[in-house]
Amino acid sequence: MSGGINAGDSKLAFESSEHVKVATTFDAMGLKEDLLRGIYAYNFEKPSAIQQRAILPIIRGRDVIAQAQSGTGKTATFSISMLQSIDTTLRETQALVLSPTRELAIQIQSVVLALGDYLNVQCHACIGGTSVGEDIRKLDYGQHIVSGTPGRVYDMIRRRHLRTKNIKMLILDESDELLNMGFKDQIYDVYRYLPPSTQVVLLSATLPQDVLEMTSKFMTDPVRILVKRDELTLEGIKQFFVAVEKEEWKFDTLCDLYDTLTITQAVIFCNTRRKVDWLSAKMKENNFQVSSMHGEMQQKERDEVMAEFRQGSSRVLITTDVWARGIDIANISLVINYDLPTNRENYIHRIGRSGRFGRKGVAINFVTVDDVRTLRDIEQFYSTQIDEMPVKLEDML
């Protein structure tokens, strides 16, 4: 994660609920000295657009709805705010972050620990698929910040290992996904255990109307920091489609593209776990090196795949939408939608992966005859244009 700001920031259109003060440097935010040291040690030089606008209202205790382009430094926005707000002399949980995936919860924990390196902060990732005993031990010891997935967090609160009486801040990251029906009930269960005065911060790349309606239930007069959707994430990302006519022809098309994929690193999205397993097995049968990940895999296995991909030893990753949210890998410049997403809002999460921090990226959509309408729907929804893929794709990378 290099410098917080990117060249596209000056062009972002902000719609905010009130005049939001812009702090153009980290020094201007009045942060703890040791937190500033952590920020600069993390190679952040200047705050990104969302950081310039959201950190101050959060540290002043306001409820905040922040919508920012994927890769603009959302995680650091709330991590810095939490680290500024907690009292490290009190070894009790004071801030709770809920994320839709285990990988994202772990990534947030690592950002908090890195930025809080000089603050002696305790931060635990409380996620399913890991040892309950270890969770209990860590929570009983005392954690300033807990980053977790809703199911395990609720379980630990219910069992009274995660003590909530000192929690003053609840962060909902990727809240469009979190507040989808799957997680909605669990979030309400967690929320009921928190002190009534708890500050709520909601972050997401997309904010559909139903999410905004739900915020009214547990937010008071929130500051809204919104980026207009047509600017969101797609700027700087070249989008193409390949007309494959039939589903069976997608595989040959992918094989033809393989040499181009491995120039940098590529992520290939399928809509189901079964399809991920089938495609990665078929690629390997044909002597193509790929790795794969989906939500049904054991946590340990998912961690290993992520580590290999982060280090660059694996260059092509086949996955489902579980991966599409917030996972930060620097070198990805190519995303392939082997299947177009069933939920058009996931499109931005998938291809936002390929241009993080304003870096250029390429997205390729495999389109059968049946997919044409979906593709047009995506174009219309994002006010964007998806052209036919050029012959010399490598020139784009």
Swiss-Prot record:
CDD domains: DEADc_EIF4AIII_DDX48, SF2_C_DEAD. Residues 236-397 form the Helicase C-terminal domain. SMART domains: DEXDc, HELICc. Its EC number is 3.6.4.13. A motif (DEAD box) lies at residues 173-176. Its main location: nucleus. GO terms for cellular component: catalytic step 2 spliceosome; nucleolus. Keywords: ATP-binding, Helicase, Hydrolase, Nucleotide-binding, Nucleus, Ribosome biogenesis, RNA-binding, rRNA processing. A motif (Q motif) lies at residues 24-52. GO terms for molecular function: ATP binding; ATP hydrolysis activity; mRNA binding; RNA helicase activity. Pfam families: DEAD, Helicase_C. One of its GO terms (biological process) is rRNA processing. Gene3D superfamilies: P-loop containing nucleotide triphosphate hydrolases. InterPro entries: DEAD/DEAH_box_helicase_dom, Helicase_ATP-bd, Helicase_C-like, P-loop_NTPase, RNA_helicase_DEAD_Q_motif. It catalyses: ATP + H2O = ADP + phosphate + H(+). Residues 55-225 form the Helicase ATP-binding domain. ATP binds at A68, Q69, S70, G71, T72, G73, K74, T75. Belongs to the DEAD box helicase family. DDX48/FAL1 subfamily. ATP-dependent RNA helicase involved in 40S ribosomal subunit biogenesis. Required for the processing and cleavage of 35S pre-rRNA at sites A0, A1, and A2, leading to mature 18S rRNA. The Q motif is unique to and characteristic of the DEAD box family of RNA helicases and controls ATP binding and hydrolysis. PANTHER family: ATP-DEPENDENT RNA HELICASE DBP3. This is ATP-dependent RNA helicase FAL1. The gene is FAL1.
